[in-house]
């Protein structure tokens, strides 16, 4: 998705684990797009249903989390069919690489776009702080790498929310959630 948007001329596109595309705006990030993937496997192999939501225009009202539109990421937003074509072209290339080498084929590119690489973050679940530490991107399996007082934690669950920690707002001793494994 980020590749396709950049091919259209979008700038300041960043990624947030596990499935958001952000736009860097003055001093912050705003959600530009989200991706949901449902996987299933049977005797015929694996299948995926991929849903993509992309804001073409900024939202008309304030939302709980900052949101952006594609029109803010570029001069002159392209027509919808051009946006779809660019996204599908890049999606085909990414799925092909993933089929051969898994996430490791995309890891370096993902890390370069990672919004909070090397920054303090908080992992939230059910509106509670589960864990906080320094975010170091993702490993070859796509698990989030979070350095905490207990060491490097691998986060697998996509049912959590990752947020930056404002300066001076670190909690101490946040617990360890399900789906977190030390390395």
Protein language model annotation of sequence segments:
Residues 1-183:
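Catalytic beta-strand/loop module used to bind and position nucleotide/cofactor moieties
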């Amino acid at each position: 998705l980020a590749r396709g948007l950049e091919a259209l001329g979008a700038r300041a596109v960043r990624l947030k684990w596990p499935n958001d595309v952000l736009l860097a705006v003055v001093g912050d990030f705003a959600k530009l797009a989200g991706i949901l993937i449902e996987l299933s496997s049977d005797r015929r192999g694996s299948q995926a249903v991929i849903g993509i939501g992309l804001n073409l225009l900024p939202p008309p009202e304030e939302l709980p989390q900052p949101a952006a539109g594609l029109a803010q990421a570029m001069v002159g937003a392209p027509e919808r069919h051009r946006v779809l074509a660019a996204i599908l072209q890049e999606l085909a290339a990414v799925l092909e690489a993933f089929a051969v080498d898994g996430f490791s084929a995309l890891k370096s590119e993902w890390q370069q776009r990672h919004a909070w690489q090397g920054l303090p973050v908080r992992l939230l679940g059910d509106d509670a702080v589960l864990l906080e530490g320094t975010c170091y991107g993702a490993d070859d399996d796509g698990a989030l790498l979070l350095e905490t007082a207990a060491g490097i934690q691998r986060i697998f669950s996509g049912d959590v929310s990752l947020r930056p920690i404002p300066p001076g707002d670190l909690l101490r001793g946040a617990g360890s959630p399900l789906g977190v494994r030390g390395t």
